[in-house]
């Protein structure tokens, strides 16, 4: 009887081992290949110094794994429950356990954040976006000049200058320059209001005209309350057929920022030089924020045609050239050292 009992125990052990092996193989195959990314992308934060248990629990709370304990067991079984990368991840529902473990260990999916300040042009945006996406600058430059993408986004300019809305963006791992640029233009479209389109008809201006004007206002204004007044100066000049004579357009044309625009700068041959060419420039010179767009659409009701900057960022606004000349002289005199 003892030999039969021993044989039964041996059979049971073999069956249990076989079941365990099947379970392990099945779990491994499911973890490696089961599930396809689908559904929303969620943000998961893995604190610095966190254990794999903490990371697994975070994935569980986000609904990315149904059983954090089994997920930990799978990672331990495959020898990959160490050396995870801390940070904030953007991960899509439906990913396999294998891909999630790989993401945690390699930092794949780590959120990449970029803040575009108001008034930045493509000269600043392109290298900043390239650094965040970890791609060559030329690939981002190609994306913003992609005529097919510009046409697809229904924009009336050869590049995306002015339409990459200034804001803070979160990009997932492996986001392409084209996808990032599209997100930024879509943010612009989301900010643009239907009543602004109606306002264009009242002003007899195109949206590109307004964005171009708003970009100049953005570069000129230091104080928020002066934006509508600066806008009014340019609207008044346009109405009277006067050249805008906006220094930021000259700086854009020469590709450099000078503290003071020189006579040599003013002579630059460019359609963006509003000293030499009447009317608005061909397109925006920077990315304006919402406040500057609103100022371009709704200028203050003032008669001013001139303004000059004071050292503290304020501007002196005047109606006649004589008054403007006097204001400049007063500012120059005030800056001279007293004896």
Task: Locate the predicted segments by residue.
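N-terminal type II signal-anchor transmembrane helix
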Residues: 2-41
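Signal peptide-directed extracytoplasmic domains
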Residues: 30-192
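Bacterial extracytoplasmic/cell-wall-associated proteins, especially those involved in peptidoglycan
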Residues: 51, 131-138, 142, 149-339
